[in-house]
Regions:
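Conserved ABC ATPase signature
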Residues: 99-103
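Conserved small/polar residues in nucleotide/adenosyl-binding loops
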Residues: 159-166
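Conserved ABC transporter NBD signature motif
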Residues: 28-36, 43-44
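Helix-to-loop junction immediately C-terminal to a conserved catalytic motif
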Residues: 20
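Catalytic Walker B motif of ABC-type/P-loop ATPase nucleotide-binding domains
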Residues: 124-127
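Conserved catalytic motifs of ABC-family nucleotide-binding domains
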Residues: 120
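Conserved ABC ATPase "signature" region
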Residues: 68, 72-95
Length: 166
């Protein structure tokens, strides 16, 4: 488990956007396992699951549908999909077939983590993963992130709230 700490405006989210391919950098190189992300874009996207700060989920799809769509975007063969396992790990099984618009904020956060996991990346990057949630839910989310580590996934969290995030 790794953390990148810094005040608001320090560029933490920009780094995530560069890694995710939604922003370009001006100079320098970023390598993942020795591969330059600019020249090996597909491999780097497969290596990283990104959990954005914003609760970007489609309100008119169920969590299960969203995971299946995400798996399809990453060309995960149907036989290799583990959406039910991921829903269970993120404690979303009971809401798997409910419209996402009916999920609480904490459930939406967990759904974003699940979507980042669906293509089985070895690295998951969490951008302010507990923003806007209460202390009890924050603890539950961190427990889920620890589960990811036990599953062998390297987790990198970006935050400016160090004192509250452990």
């Amino acid at each position: 488990f790794y953390g990148l700490l810094g005040p608001n405006g320090a560029g933490k989210s920009t780094i995530i956007n560069i890694l995710g391919g939604t922003t370009t950098k001006d100079t320098g190189k970023i390598k993942i396992w020795g591969l330059n992300i600019d020249t090996h874009r597909k491999q780097s996207k497969l290596a990283i699951g990104i959990v954005p700060q914003e609760l970007n989920i489609d309100a008119f799809f169920t969590p299960k549908d969203q995971l299946e769509l995400q798996a399809g975007l990453f060309n995960v063969p149907k036989k290799q999909r583990v959406t039910d396992y991921i829903l269970e790990l993120m404690e979303l099984t009971e809401k798997a077939n409910s419209y996402s618009r009916n999920l609480s904020g904490g459930m939406r956060r967990r759904l974003l983590v699940a979507k980042a996991m669906v293509h089985n990346p070895p690295i998951i990057i969490l951008d302010e993963p507990t923003a806007g949630v209460d202390i009890e839910l924050r603890k539950k989310l961190w427990d889920n992130f620890k589960k990811l580590n036990k599953e062998g996934i390297t987790t990198v969290s970006y935050t400016h709230l160090l004192a509250h995030e452990t």
